[in-house]
């Protein structure tokens, strides 16, 4: 029955005749087919993509405190904000000055001497000539909330207490410092503010730029053939180290599948003076390996606005699909 007939019956106070039942079923069926077709078309590009193995996961590292030693793990959960093992999160803790500005090994090279063990839901900090510091992995909500500053952007941090502040201050011996922790209910620093020229959308806590840094052991071997003093992977602080590929093959990787995790390239990693800090002594060199890297790893002139004169070593990734990964997992390039 047409719309005019239905409205006429309504004016007479009579009920409108119902649509035939078969017509409603048919309409629902057509809608389901249409939605299924749309979903299939959207999924089709992913389904038809080929997986090409490019290497194998050799190492996984979580760096709980920015600029302190990394914690090697055999497996990890990969969240949108980076690697996680239990309550141990990548760069969820940060040393700050009293005014909230971040402190890294660029200013305090001896931070790289602080090691961290995760045990019984606690972080155990150890450093040369210091008693160990034991902190719970979650701070009381009654602790002060700090306004922190990282590369010109604001972010919150929960104070980790006076004992932690005293421990870091006594070890570094320069000025008063405090330790803060990022909480998952806090707002991270967004990629749109960190990297406004790039078209990606993610958040990070206290990393420099991105949730993940991937490197290959072959690229480090290549660098060391040019170096008088050999560098360690710890100089470069990657989250995922890949073996079984050629040097700098990672420059060509866009989207990767590792375990059940899918990641997408954001940019190459522009290297800074932090790489010149010896991870074993905490002494800053200020020249190597930067000078050597600059001799053959500068960006194309067309990318100078993004990278300036920083040499490129390693690749930053965002997390497209969360999941888990482990040492020994094949690394697939999605092509």
Curated annotation (Swiss-Prot):
List residues modified as N6-acetyllysine.
Answer: 156
Q: Where in the cell is it found?
A: Mitochondrion outer membrane; Peroxisome
- One GO location term (cellular component): mitochondrial outer membrane
Q: What is its main location?
A: mitochondrion
Q: Which keywords does this chain's UniProt record carry? A: Acetylation, Isopeptide bond, Membrane, Mitochondrion, Mitochondrion outer membrane, Molybdenum, Oxidoreductase, Peroxisome, Transit peptide, Ubl conjugation
The UniProt entry, under SUPFAM superfamilies, shows: MOSC N-terminal domain-like, PK beta-barrel domain-like
Give the stretches traversing the membrane: none
Q: Which cofactor does it need?
A: Mo-molybdopterin
Cofactor binding remark = Binds 1 Mo-molybdopterin (Mo-MPT) cofactor per subunit.
Sum up the protein's function in the record's words: Catalyzes the reduction of N-oxygenated molecules, acting as a counterpart of cytochrome P450 and flavin-containing monooxygenases in metabolic cycles. As a component of prodrug-converting system, reduces a multitude of N-hydroxylated prodrugs particularly amidoximes, leading to increased drug bioavailability. May be involved in mitochondrial N(omega)-hydroxy-L-arginine (NOHA) reduction, regulating endogenous nitric oxide levels and biosynthesis.
Instruction: Please identify the protein, giving its name as recorded.
Output: Mitochondrial amidoxime reducing component 2
